[in-house]
Amino acid sequence: MELALITAQQVAVLFLLIGTGMVAVKTGVLKLENKQALSNLLVYIVVPAMVVNSYRMEFSAQILHNLLAAFGMSVLSVLLGTVITLLFTARKTGSRMPIFRFACIFSNAAYMGFPLISALFGSEGLLYASAYVTVFNILLWTLGYGLVSGGSSVKEVARSLVRTPVLYAIVVGLGIYLLQIPLPTLITQPLELLAGVNTPLSMLITGMLIAAGDVRSIVTDKHIWKLASVRMLLIPAATLALFGVLGFHGTAAQVVTLLECCPAAAITSVFAVQFGHDEHFAAGSVVLTTLLSIVTLPLCALIITMVM
């Protein structure tokens, strides 16, 4: 119950930050074309700094064990979501299906998940979240890229992975953690300051995305509601059930499960534009699932604390 209340409070805070982003766009303080630059700042600088900073803790064999377990649980959860999505859409065709499948499988772990995990579980939770994001990125740029591009070469996939900065941040962070490398204040202070930017910046970007969408047309689109039911209800419930059957519990399991409860990945819209898919459907999927998460995330946290 305590985790659910903290989650509800944190989601409310995130929603206020999202609202700030929406107001900033509506009043002209921020332009929609600024979204890509802010997103690049987040992905290439802020999130990597936050990941490296999260590894700055005293070595613990138990935490290392939990970290390795988090990697395994992350692989299991994302693959489970993939199987569920492919089964759900097995007999469905249409131009929206690539985006439908992608948005169901891949959650907004970085934008929505990291701020939430940081607030609920602190640095240890971020360690386990970084394990999830590592698995997430590898599958996103292989399986996910293939889903929306209609097939991709090994060279294209490798190039995409090499351009994923958070993977380098995890390697550096792991090195610092395992070798217990002391960092000077000149390095740690900028890392901490940049890490602190993650939550407000990611929520401002989410608010800008919502401001750009037509909420009325989004909430009347039955296909987006079907997508939301898979992304926000079916996959989290299946993950929770599977982890319960396998006896997974503790902070690492809670973190991975909560990340699976997050809305559709913001990059869904980017891929829709890049590969000529229905970008309004993609943006609508992100917007609706993000709005629904204001209610569903606290409920998921409540259930997680009851069974894990």
Where are the regions a protein language model picked out?
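Alpha-helical transmembrane segments of multi-pass small-molecule/ion transporters
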Residues: M1-M308
